[in-house]
Amino acid sequence: MRGKLITLEGIDGSGKSTVAKKLQENSELRVFEPVFTREPTRGTLTGNAVENAIQSDTDQLAELFLFTADHAEHLAKLVKPALEDGKTVISDRYSDSRYAYQGITLKNRLDNPLEWVRDLHRGWTVIPDLTFLFDIEPEIAVKRCGKRGEQTKFEKIEFLRGVRELFLGLAAEEPERFVIVDASGSPEDVEKAVVQKILDFVQRIE
């Protein structure tokens, strides 16, 4: 039986990646041996190219294609093989991040960037079975980002407002796939809520 793909999404500063790390250490989840991964990938040719683009003034379209190339490589080398092996894959960021983030970065370049980016993925990407959207007010998120040190170009409040709006729009379109998580609480409380939802989901499909 094909495995299931679970993704974690949210704006920068939502605490998503902090919770993703906690999930890897969670004893309740270890029972079904999930495969943990992330986008952009780390230590790969495509992932390194994306990280360099994020830290530089790369053209927005070029940046999109770098993200998409990394996604394709990620699917081919890790996600699809793991799913075909019947494993549950949990990814910190996935295609919805591209739809929301590049939907904003390209708004002055394309008439409908969100749909354009989605069309770019149709026919070859793997749609997640369950997506957690870590929702938080951009003002709180930016403060959290500031505590981490130097901010990236994506960690600006007006930009994150637009990204959050697109994320919530995506969730409204597919309520059966998305679970909106209040990310304003402590990482421990958020982790507990997410773990319970994952366990419920896994038990339901077994």
UniProtKB/Swiss-Prot annotation:
Cellular-component GO terms for this entry: cytoplasm
Entries under InterPro entries matching the protein: P-loop_NTPase (IPR027417), Thymidylate_kin-like_dom (IPR039430), Thymidylate_kinase (IPR018094)
Catalysed reactions, as listed in the record: dTMP + ATP = dTDP + ADP
Keywords: ATP-binding, Kinase, Nucleotide biosynthesis, Nucleotide-binding, Transferase
Keyword Kinase: yes
SUPFAM superfamilies for the chain: P-loop containing nucleoside triphosphate hydrolases (SSF52540)
Sites where the protein binds ATP: G10, I11, D12, G13, S14, G15, K16, S17
Family: Belongs to the thymidylate kinase family.
Name recorded for this polypeptide: Probable thymidylate kinase
